[in-house]
């Protein structure tokens, strides 16, 4: 009974508890269903929102492309409208002219002109109305390609136009004008622009020099330029001693390959500014500016040319102080007859003139040469001698020789005859007579001062022929463009510098010395050389000189050198060097002068040397030094034979 009651109590207790549990479970299940439904709704709303956002973004992009197309269409319509406006202005101007003329002729023509003007004035409105269509319609790819092609063509036309020219692009004239030189330069200082500006300035300066040289050639004077470079002048202004820089052969050739002056007008510029189309006032202003710039450039060019011409003429007037006869050919000397003005002193290296009479008789096969007189010889103060003698030899055989007696004075008169026998008429044209003037000294050997070669091909067949020969100071007889070959005339005179002195083959140097005891300055002028030859090849050498001042024990006190003279057997230096030497040291110093041949790819080669002063290389050098000390400031010039090393 108790058990039954207990089980019934348990059932009564668990029955409501189980019902409560079931209700709780149902409530939880309903809540889960509601949550799942709400989650599904939220996911649907999110998908709708994302789709809406994507659609909005697409709409925005479509609107942007539409606006861009609209702006591009507006630009095209504006350009076409501007072109139409320009054409309307052009036609309106033309119609206004027609209207003025029509008013003078008849009223009907006047009315017709007004109608045409009004019709033209309505074109921009039509164009603007028509251009509204592309705002709605899409653009065509072919039209875009055509417009891009037109733009590239216009840009290419601008780049290809030359300065100051007019070109037509798509029916419209384009004007390119340039300003002054300052406007051509850009703001960036790059190396390329600097190099371009340098090349332009060099081409202009070279063109100025070429024009000046052409004007100098048109004067009719055949005198050639001389080397007049010097380190210091004879005055007492300079104190420093510096070596001259070597002349560059490439720079010398560059002067003969100059650009003409007309090419400066086609120099490319760094920037150009095309004028606006349809602006007639701007066109006129650009033409005026270009004409003003061209006139200013022309004035500056003419001024610089006048300055260089004046400089060249001044150098020509001063050229009488030097001698360039050794640089001329015999034909040029025969044609040239320059008169030295009175009051100008004779050049130091001038050898004078020799009057000769030729007479050939074919019957006896004899050639008689009469040496009449010599004129214009250097005086004793310059040459150091006052006695003269003429040697004559028949080339190429050198078997027939003759000489005159010694005569004294600056204008010696000889009047002596030299006869060459057994000279057949067929051999006359192949022969030549060489005249050499020697300075005769007592107890010493003769010194050759000048020479001249006369070709018998110029000889008259019968009768006498009077000729005045210009004596060249130690010139190279084989370099005058003669009809005789160098080997036929004298092989020793053209290829060797080691022959005997009787043939005049030894290299010599003309040196000027002066000393000022007050300032203690020893001035040494290396004037010119003679018979400088290149033993390696059969061509004239490239020579330069070196000067050394040595003390009593042979130590070097100072040195300097001249510039290079290229391809000259008889170079003219005319360079002066100043050494500071006290009066009490003058008898203890030695001046050594060496001449070198500069050879490519090889070491330099010494042509010869001389020494003056305490350890003189010979009696002539010692006499020259002593005479310099006695003259007290006056320059003494002497020829010296170079000693081979």
UniProtKB/Swiss-Prot annotation:
The keyword Glycoprotein does not apply. Residues 485-502 have a biased composition (Low complexity). Residues 350-469, 505-640 form the C2 domain. One of its GO terms (molecular function) is identical protein binding. Gene3D superfamilies: C2 domain. Residues 179-192 have a biased composition (Acidic residues). Residues 167-177, 287-303 have a biased composition (Polar residues). Keywords: Repeat. The keyword Repeat applies. Residues 102-121, 144-192, 206-344, 478-503 are annotated as: Disordered. Expressed in brain. May be involved in the trafficking and exocytosis of secretory vesicles in non-neuronal tissues. Is Ca(2+)-independent. Homodimer. Can also form heterodimers. PANTHER family: SYNAPTOTAGMIN 14, ISOFORM D, SYNAPTOTAGMIN-16. Belongs to the synaptotagmin family. This is Synaptotagmin-16. It comes from Homo sapiens. The gene is SYT16.
């Amino acid at each position: 009974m108790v058990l039954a009651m207990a089980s019934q109590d348990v059932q009564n207790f668990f029955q409501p508890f189980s019902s409560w549990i079931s209700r709780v479970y149902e409530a939880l299940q309903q809540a889960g269903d509601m949550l799942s439904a709400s989650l599904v709704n939220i996911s649907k709303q999110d998908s709708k929102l994302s789709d809406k956002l994507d659609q909005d973004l697409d709409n925005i992009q479509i609107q942007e492309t539409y606006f861009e197309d609209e702006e591009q269409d507006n630009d095209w319509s504006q350009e076409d409208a501007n072109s139409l406006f320009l054409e309307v202005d052009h036609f309106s101007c033309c119609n206004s002219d027609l209207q003025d003329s029509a008013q003078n002729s008849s009223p009907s023509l006047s009315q017709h002109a007004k109608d045409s003007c009004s019709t033209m004035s309505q074109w921009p409105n039509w164009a603007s109305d028509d251009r509204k269509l592309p705002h709605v319609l899409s653009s065509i790819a072919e039209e875009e390609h055509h417009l891009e092609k037109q733009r590239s063509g216009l840009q290419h036309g601008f780049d290809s136009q030359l300065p100051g020219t007019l070109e037509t692009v798509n029916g419209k004239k384009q004007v390119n004008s340039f300003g002054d030189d300052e406007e051509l330069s850009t703001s960036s200082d790059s190396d390329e622009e600097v190099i371009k500006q340098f090349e332009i300035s060099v081409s202009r300066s070279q063109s100025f020099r070429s024009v000046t040289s052409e004007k100098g050639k048109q004067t009719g004077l055949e005198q050639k330029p001389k080397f007049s470079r010097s380190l210091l002048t004879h005055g007492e202004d300079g104190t420093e001693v510096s070596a001259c820089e070597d002349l560059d052969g490439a720079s010398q050739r560059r002067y003969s390959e100059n650009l003409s002056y007309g090419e400066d007008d086609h120099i490319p510029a760094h920037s150009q500014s095309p004028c606006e189309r349809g602006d007639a006032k701007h066109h006129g202003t650009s033409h005026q500016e270009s004409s003003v710039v061209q006139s200013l450039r022309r004035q500056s060019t003419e001024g610089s040319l006048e300055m260089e011409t004046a400089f060249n003429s001044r150098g020509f007037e001063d050229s009488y102080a030097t001698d360039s006869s050794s640089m001329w050919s015999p034909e040029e000397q025969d044609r040239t007859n320059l008169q030295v003005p009175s009051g100008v002193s004779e050049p130091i290296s001038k050898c004078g003139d020799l009057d000769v009479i030729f007479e050939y008789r074919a019957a006896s096969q004899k050639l008689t040469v009469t040496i009449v007189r010599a004129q214009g010889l250097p005086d004793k103060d310059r040459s150091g001698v006052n006695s003269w003698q003429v040697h004559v030899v028949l080339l190429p055989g050198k078997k027939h020789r003759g000489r005159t007696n010694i005569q004294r004075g600056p204008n010696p008169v000889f009047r002596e005859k030299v006869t060459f026998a057994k000279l057949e008429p067929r051999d006359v044209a192949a022969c030549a007579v060489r005249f050499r003037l020697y300075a005769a000294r007592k107890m010493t050997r003769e010194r050759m001062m000048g020479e001249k070669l006369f070709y018998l091909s110029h000889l008259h067949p019968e009768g006498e022929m009077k000729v005045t020969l210009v004596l060249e100071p130690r010139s190279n007889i084989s370099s005058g463009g003669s009809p005789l070959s160098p080997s036929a005339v004298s092989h020793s005179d053209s290829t060797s510098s080691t022959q005997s002195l009787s043939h005049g083959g030894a290299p010599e140097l003309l040196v000027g010395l002066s000393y000022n005891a007050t300032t203690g300055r020893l001035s040494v002028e290396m004037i010119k050389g003679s018979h400088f030859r290149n033993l390696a090849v059969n061509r004239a050498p490239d020579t330069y000189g070196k000067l050394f001042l040595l003390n009593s024990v042979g130590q070097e006190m100072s040195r300097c050198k001249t510039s290079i003279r290229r391809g000259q057997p008889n170079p003219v230096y005319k360079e002066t060097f100043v050494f500071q030497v006290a009066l009490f040291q003058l008898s203890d110093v030695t001046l050594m002068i060496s001449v070198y041949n500069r050879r490519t790819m090889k070491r330099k080669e010494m042509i010869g040397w001389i020494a003056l002063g305490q350890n003189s290389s010979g009696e002539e050098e010692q006499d020259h030094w002593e005479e310099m000390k006695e003259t007290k400031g006056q320059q003494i010039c002497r020829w010296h034979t170079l000693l081979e090393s």
